[in-house]
Amino acid sequence: GLSTMKRREFLGGAAASGAVLTMPVFLSGCGIQQAAAVADKTPENPFMEWFGVDQATTARVMSELSANGADAADLYFQHSRTNYLTLEDGIVSSASSDIQQGVGLRVVIGEQTGYAFTEDLTLPSMLAAARTASAIASGNKAVAPQTFSALGAGDLYRTAVPWSDVGIDQKLPLMKFVEAQAKSMDEAVEKVAVYWADQDERVMIATLDGRLVTDHRPMTRVTVTVTARRGEEVQSGFSNIAAREEFGWYTEERLNTMVREAVDRTMVLFDARRPPAGEMPVILASGASGILLHEAIGHGMEADFNRKGVSIYSDMIGKKVAEPFVTVVDQATIPRERGALNYDDEGNEAGRTVLVEDGILKSYLHDTISAKQYDLQPTGSGRRESYKYAPMPRMSCTFMEDGPHTKEEIIESVDRGIICETYTNGQVQIGAGDYTFYVKNGWLVENGKVTAPIKDVNIIGNGPESLKRITMVANDARLDTGGWTCGKNGQSVPVSQGIPTVLVSKMTVGGENVG
């Protein structure tokens, strides 16, 4: 509808609709509850152990869900516990846990989707929800399975120690270490805040075609924010790291690297200036610049936007969209990545989808519904925020592959331009792909050399146009380590993104002479 065409903020605040990519500095949960500790192995009978339901109950609910007909149907059981901790000036200023449990019931008939959810996993409650969801249909009963066959557990992010077994007494010393390191790195640092989040999530998906998928999805993220003062001038910066990992992942070395980055990003701002404004070549630094790839280009490659004709790429499959050394991939199967998934939220195996190969648009990202509409196999891209939502095509780990150039060659080729390194917020219009990004850290390039740090810069452009204007791609591709969260149509999911150093031949830079 029209709402997908509206401009939407994506880093500054939440958006009701459309594409949102945030890296929140902190999130607060609410309501501390005890969750039963569950051993991290795939149980013999996942129904009984995780959700207190069995084959017969599930079959009964599926039968009710498909009673008026169904092309597809699924039950999405979810239990998650998220823990949050904040350390400010040596004091724990907040500690909370957020527990979610429920089941989402979906039936799909042609173009229509019926959806209902309940937090109550008793049979009467699930049957009532199934009747609500199936009310959109008025056909003949679909054949529902009596039993479900379990698919093997994936091993992209197996952990030995679940987060439910890790106490505050273990997390706090690490947070205090981060704070102490930040303060010791520069005497100008006067305030440090450390934000911790960890999550144990278990999902179980039963489908109309008799599949049963279980996935245990751990997640953790630590963010440090640094505020420094020189005379009257105050600057701040942050850094974070996130992964589907366990407690042991947080080594001193890894935390140190994160702190160093936050302090460096903060201190350089005291010497940074605004660059001249106008049209110029822009170098996007490796890693975090994946935000442009994800936001301004990736969303346009999600099948639902193309099916509705909203995306500029809707008639471009098989056509040239970039130079021949540009390849863009969405891959959920990168171990331990924040955006990694063994299975998507429809129970399809997650995989690797080449979106752009050697400059040619090859595929969209599909969920079950869009794949059927295009007469293709799903790409394992059906994702949802929780059991309260129906899935839709979403990205996982989205990145551009290595190219034939080097970072040095790219810098040497620029007479006058800028390098963009870190980003804080912006807007994107999904259909056209028009974007504005706010660059927090960057560098001025003059006569093929990096000359001075810059700050307070806006870059303005069009995603598909910028993709076409990438004239050099370096061989230093990397995924950003930060904890990115992507929002679309009001649903947030964790993602990863990355890119090598690339040169965009022309982009509008808002600097000195812009209001």
Regions found by a protein language model. Give the residues of each.
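Secretory targeting signals
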Residues: G1-M5
